[in-house]
């Protein structure tokens, strides 16, 4: 084994993984981000994939990417231009040339840079780097596809299945370049493919082969070390905004002593909240995938009336459809958390792109005088606190709360220190059992100190009542 010539220490680096939509760049970037978070680096990530139906393989329209910014100090954004680009084909190189620093490192699969591949990406010469003016970049080239197929013969996989592992070979190269141990990545792959052990072992073999290839063949290339950030002791993980939002709602329900209910309809980029909470039946979470946006929020209003911490998740188009039901929650004075993960454009717009343009809709997009609390999260990790406080405000003030995030925050991830729950305040519902007044109780009787309507859970003896959308005089 040849010795490495030198190791350079960096404070931060931006890495961009890019290839066809089927090349597994999202998984590759996610695993490397998790490795970096476990290692103790600060991270910020941004998955970038087309809004259109999957384009033909190897074309410019079909390029998918994942960018991670990591460092030994506080990282606030996924970064602008990349120090390292993993380009699985010529289209990925061409699409991302504008995102590259002049002296960047580019890792390529030479098997995917043949003339037919260059033609698909609309190159006019057989030298894409010169054609793009990338004379200052350092190229780390490897016949990834060939090596993966040869290395996985023992597993008896067909050609297509074997090539699906080439992203792990590329990940192994990046792990070698940044001195990342492979054990945690192997563990992640075993969990990812727990029901397909042969696929798990094939991916682990490709990962190891990529690392060894870099270590043995490219020994003249400098490797890089990014020290772990000196951080507060505790347990850390890599979390995206949708997952943090889900955990924040669970924490709020726990602090309130309530069961969490989510009634939702799948919509990009909010669907992962429904997916995440549906996994937590062990914590008593109830999820309903309704037939449409209106049904989703109406099931949540019913659950709130029945005594749950109720929530619904959506994006801009869905928030428009839910507006009348939000008005129902306002007039009924029921606690409800509405999560709007904002996306681009009016109408269907750009489902996979990010905007922050729903504020006016959240504030004023309902008929009549229909006030509601509106909050916004600022980072993926901030989504936990924002969701917790949204739940607290909704329950303690008997009101709908709209929590705004966006696709950038929801899909991007950061290193997150898992908080101790004893540092969060209790959530105290204004139950009707606390009602003390000479007047006969009616549905809109209020706590004299807070002016909050009492919450009468169905089944509470002596407090049978009805609520609806018609204005009442009591």
Describe these PLM feature segments.
Residues 116-122, 151, 323, 346-352, ...:
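Glycine-rich, charge-decorated loop segments at or immediately adjacent to ligand/cofactor-binding or catalytic sites
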Residues 231, 239-248, 256, 386, ...:
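Flexible, low-complexity linker and terminal segments
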Residues 1-256:
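Active-site cofactor/cluster-binding pocket
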Residues 12, 150-153, 219-234, 252-259, ...:
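Gly-rich Lys/Arg/Thr-decorated short loops/hinges at beta-loop-alpha junctions or inter-strand turns
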Residues 49-50, 189, 206, 227-230, ...:
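A glycine-rich phosphate-binding loop feature that marks nucleotide/adenosyl-phosphate handling sites
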Residues 79, 134-137, 141-145, 353-402, ...:
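Conserved thiamine diphosphate
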Residues 12-100, 247, 260-261, 268-364, ...:
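Thiamine diphosphate
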Residues 45-49, 180-185, 314, 398-409:
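Glycine-rich phosphate/pyrophosphate-binding loops
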């Amino acid at each position: 084994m040849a010795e490495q010539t030198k190791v350079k220490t960096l404070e931060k680096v931006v890495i961009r993984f890019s290839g066809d939509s089927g090349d597994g760049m999202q998984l590759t970037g996610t695993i490397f981000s998790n490795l970096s978070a476990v290692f103790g680096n600060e991270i910020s990530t941004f998955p970038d994939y087309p809004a259109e139906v999957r384009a033909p393989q190897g074309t410019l329209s079909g390029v998918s990417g994942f960018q991670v910014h990591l460092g030994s100090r506080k990282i606030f954004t996924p970064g602008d231009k990349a120090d390292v680009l993993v380009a699985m084909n010529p289209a990925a190189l061409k699409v991302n040339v504008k995102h590259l620093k002049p002296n960047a490192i580019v890792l390529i699969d030479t098997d995917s840079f043949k003339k037919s591949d260059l033609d698909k990406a609309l190159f006019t010469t057989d030298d894409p780097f010169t054609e793009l003016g990338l004379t200052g970049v350092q190229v780390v080239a490897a016949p990834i596809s060939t090596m993966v197929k040869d290395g996985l013969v023992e597993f008896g996989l067909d050609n297509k299945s074997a090539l699906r592992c080439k992203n792990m070979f590329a990940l192994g190269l990046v792990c070698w370049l940044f001195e990342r141990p492979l054990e945690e990545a192997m563990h992640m792959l075993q969990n990812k493919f727990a029901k397909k052990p042969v696929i798990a072992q094939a991916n682990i073999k490709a990962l190891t082969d990529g690392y060894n290839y870099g270590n043995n063949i490219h020994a003249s290339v400098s490797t890089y070390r990014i020290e772990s950030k000196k951080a507060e002791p505790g347990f850390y993980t890599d979390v995206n905004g949708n997952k943090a939002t889900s955990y924040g709602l669970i924490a709020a329900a726990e602090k309130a002593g309530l069961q969490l209910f989510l009634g939702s309809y799948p919509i990009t980029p909010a669907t992962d909240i429904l997916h995440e909470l549906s996994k937590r039946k062990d914590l008593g979470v109830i999820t309903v995938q309704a037939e449409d946006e209106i049904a989703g929020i109406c099931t949540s209003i019913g659950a709130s009336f029945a005594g749950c911490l109720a929530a619904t998740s959506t994006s801009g188009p869905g928030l428009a459809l839910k507006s009348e039901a939000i008005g129902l929650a306002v007039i009924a004075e029921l606690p409800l958390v509405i999560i709007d993960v904002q996306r681009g454009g009016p109408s269907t717009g750009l489902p996979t792109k990010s905007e922050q343009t729903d504020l006016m809709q959240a504030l004023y997009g309902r008929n009549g005088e229909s006030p509601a609390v509106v909050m916004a999260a600022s980072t993926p990790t901030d989504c936990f606190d924002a969701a917790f406080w949204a739940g607290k405000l909704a329950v303690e003030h008997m009101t709908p709360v709209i929590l705004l995030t966006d696709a950038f925050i929801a899909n991007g991830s950061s290193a997150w220190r898992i908080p101790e729950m004893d540092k969060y305040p209790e959530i105290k519902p204004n139950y009707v059992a606390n009602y003390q007044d000479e007047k006969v109780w009616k549905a809109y009787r209020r706590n004299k100190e807070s002016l909050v309507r009492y919450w009468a859970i169905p089944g509470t003896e002596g407090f049978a009542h009805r609520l609806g959308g018609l204005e009442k005089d009591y």
